[in-house]
A protein has these predicted regions:
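Non-catalytic beta/alpha edge segments that cap or flank active sites
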Residues: 1-122
């Protein structure tokens, strides 16, 4: 809008819902159409965490992630409890992934989550 300051580009886009097998669940297909690279390891880890949390239907989920420009796009399930399990599982890798794809440098709050960063070579 005219007179509005320009917003910086997003480095992380998170969606919730639309990742199941029902006909209306099309979120994974939508991001596959706009992302340049898909990161299937995110979905694999989210399903693993959900299975370990005692959710046998986690195998029906189609969560995934992809790279869209310099942004990481992550699809999450629609249920709030499942969102928590899935975010807890993948978030340690998010700041480093965003750094690798040229997005903003994100700091982590060590009290909340241990963020992974590779050790620098000396």
């Amino acid at each position: 809008a005219e007179g509005s300051p320009e917003l910086p580009p997003a480095s992380l886009i998170v969606t919730t819902g639309g990742t199941g097998p029902a006909p209306r669940d099309v979120t994974p297909e939508a991001i596959e159409n706009v992302c340049q690279k898909m990161l299937p390891g995110f979905g694999e880890e989210m399903r693993r965490a959900s299975l370990l949390d005692g959710v046998p239907t986690a195998i029906l989920s189609r969560q995934t992630a992809g790279v869209c420009g310099n942004a990481l796009v992550i699809t999450l399930p629609g249920k709030p409890a499942a969102v928590r399990v899935c975010l807890d599982a993948v978030f340690p890798a998010v700041p480093y992934c965003i750094d690798l794809i040229g997005g903003a440098y994100l700091e982590g709050n060590e009290a909340a989550v241990k963020v992974f960063r590779p050790k620098k070579k000396k």
